[in-house]
Amino acid sequence: MNRIVIADDSATARMFIRRCLEIIGLGEATLVEAENGREALSLLKEEDTDLLLTDLNMPVMDGATLLKWVKSSPRLHDLPVLVITSAGNPAKEQELKALGAFGVLNKPVSPAVLRDALQSLIS
């Protein structure tokens, strides 16, 4: 993976996800951070991206709205999206997957769980 966008309104969460990616060997990828869905969408439009990791609850544009925009874009439609959230529940997880999320991970996500999700994505 060459470029990964991390969208979360918490700087601490973004730093933690960045650290998880480094631990599992993706630290060489270009890791780009956004504080909300609107910033993330802007970054996704700028340059080809291999993966979007997004929080669900963010100001300005939440993760579900971002996911809808990504999946409705002809250019971004095939972009894998993992939602990482503390607001997860089975019904919400089903809803996000129906919108096109590759997976939904609960915070705090561990490097092992993130690695397993990414391995599923690659295979």
What kind of feature is each model-predicted range?
Residues 11-32, 99:
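Two-component/phosphorelay signaling modules centered on CheY-like receiver
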Residues 33-51, 68:
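Acidic, metal-coordinating helix/loop segments flanking the phosphotransfer/catalytic sites
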Residues 55, 85:
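Active-site residues of response regulator receiver
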Residues 58:
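Receiver (REC) domain active-site loop signature in two-component systems and cognate sites
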Residues 109-118:
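C-terminal output helix
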